[in-house]
Amino acid sequence: MPARVKDRISLLGFGGAAIGNLYRAIPESMAFASVAAALAEGVLYMDTAPHYGFGLSEQRLGAALAELDPERRVVVSTKVGRRLEPRPDADLTRVRQGFVSPEPYESVFDYSYDAVMRSYEGSRARLRRDIDVLYVHDLGRRAHGERHPHLFAEFMDGGYKALRQLRDGGAVQAIGLGVNEWEVCEDALAHGDFDIMLLAGRYTLLEQTALTSFLPLCQQRKVGIVVGGPYNSGILAHDGRYGMRRQAPLMYEYQPAPPEIVARVAALEAVCQRHGVPLASAALQFPLAHPQVLSVIPGMGNPDEVRGAKEWLTLPIPATFWAELRAQGLVHPDAPLPETA
């Protein structure tokens, strides 16, 4: 991982899906205010993607940073692997591919060399600035099922060469994958040279299977990790000091949580109550104890969510809390914990 990027990435990052109108429309002013609040809280790493609102998130982030960050202190990452196809007949009032966007496009997976290059140029124009980190978006078997071997080969034979060319030529500083599954990151490291991985939802208080082989490999290869989805679709985004909460159903992986996950969250919350620790604080702080994790990037759709995340991240948590999680088997036995990090 290049030090010129690694040393500039803040522990708390800004996930840009919400300002691309994820599931619901938010006004331009709210998107701008969210970016401004993030900068005010010292957030100097911001992630987006063409898929987020079909270019809307990149446009909004670029416009805000052009005004708020003229010195270009912020490390910006975006993604390739989905090209934007015009859809002039699209119903702009409904949710399309998860977003309510005024942009008449849809995103189509394409991991070829030409598509990656075109995507990079489009993102650079929308962001109005150079791109620091470029991820390939949503490779993997979870995303593509039976098509995964074909698309992985398409990427390694085409899109990967484009990423290498952009990095080696100095157009971007670091390259990696932005995905929801660590297994494809491990496969990619067996076939190529990557600097950083954005892993969403796979190294959290609820899931630590990445510790078995992937994270040790990242340590060996000096690959940095950004943890997306630290709240696991929101099920961990709770105070937790005052008992179970929220309306049913609880959501996990964007669908109703299975009984074993609900039970695990209840066990975590019971420990939170005993130690006076917000569950969301533990969810944000836990991944950062691992030496390869550079940043956590929860979704931030308004200034209150930004300020809340910063408060949760910096709240002191007693060592006895982490010790009880370990003693109860609520975290992997090999997981680094903040009190020993």
Residue locations for each model-derived region?
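N-terminal binding-site loop/beta-alpha segment at the start of enzyme catalytic domains
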Residues: 1-80, 84-89, 93
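Short glycine/proline-rich turn/loop motifs
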Residues: 15, 98-104, 139-144, 249
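Active-site mouth loops of central-metabolism enzymes
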Residues: 17-29, 101-117, 148
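Beta/alpha (TIM)-barrel catalytic core signal, keyed to glycine-rich beta->alpha loops juxtaposed to Asp/Glu
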Residues: 30, 121, 125, 132, ...
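Solvent-exposed, non-membrane alpha-helical residues enriched in polar/charged side chains
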Residues: 36, 62, 66, 117, ...
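Generic enzyme active-site microenvironment
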Residues: 45, 77, 130, 135-136
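Short, flexible, mixed-charge acidic loops at enzyme active sites
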Residues: 87-99, 238-246
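An active-site-proximal structural segment forming one wall of the substrate-binding cleft
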Residues: 110-130
